[in-house]
Amino acid sequence: MIKDQHHNVAGDGHDDHAQKPPFHATIITVFPEMFPGPLGLSTTGRALGRVWSLDTVDVKGFVTGPFGRVDDSPFGGGAGMVLRPDVVGQALDTGGGFQGRPCYYLSPRGQRFTQAHAVSLAKGNGVVLLCGRYEGLDQRVLDHYNIAEISMGDYVLSGGEIAAMAMLDACVRLLPGVMGNDDSGTEESFSAPLLEYPHYTRPAEWKGMDVPKVLRSGHHAAIKAWRKEQAERITRDRRPDLWEIYTSGTRPDCFVKDD
């Protein structure tokens, strides 16, 4: 008999019967104890249970038989083990459903996750994230459930959980009421094809280095111009690919926001 492996992650009095906030994330994973992890701290943690909610589905709970396991050796041979489609499929079927939310499988071969993805997801009612482990997931699961693959970058992690945390952090911080200044999200790197300008705070002098005078001038137009100039310089020096996009005047999908 398969026990209920669907667990709400606590957040400010949030319980199994409480009404979920507008943005709800479900993590399907072999290691549910990893959550909320850092998502339970700082701004995302303070908003958990109030602005957004999180639950996990433990894939291990859907193993059947005395010698059941979540993974098996790959057909055709090769290194590593592959997550079984029958076990993961059960987790997807009984884990609460997608409920109109998009579902992504965290994978290094997926489409690159961008700020535009975060903006788009933050406007919806949540997301379902399927975390891979071992050598990966049986392809039939992705095909049957029409699950899109998404990647956090050109590197390989031990599993999808850390990538899922990064993806959720990028989305949740854009939800209304999460950040103290709602303009913060629109002024950061990748909200436009420019990297962010430098930041300074008190003290005005530290180890012989002064805060640029323009930032202490109170002249808002001059400050805005200085910040744009710095953002352009940093982008040109560090990310020629973004600089080319910026100077061409085009805005590809990774920078386009839905109105």
Regions found by a protein language model. Name each.
Residues 1-95, 220-244:
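N-terminal nucleotide/polyanion-binding subdomain common to many enzyme families
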Residues 26-28, 55-57, 102-104, 127-129, ...:
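Hydrophobic/aromatic beta-strand patches that form the interior of the parallel beta-sheet core
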Residues 30, 59, 106-109, 131-134, ...:
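Fold-independent oxyanion-binding glycine-rich loops
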Residues 42-47, 119-123, 144-146:
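Short, solvent-exposed amphipathic alpha-helical segments in soluble enzyme
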Residues 83-133, 138-139:
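S-adenosyl-L-methionine/SAH cofactor-binding core of RNA-modifying enzymes
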Residues 137, 141-190:
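Structured adenosyl-cofactor binding patch, chiefly the S-adenosyl-L-methionine
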Residues 190-248, 252:
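Long, charged alpha-helical interface segments
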Residues 251-259:
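Oxyanion-binding "anion nests"
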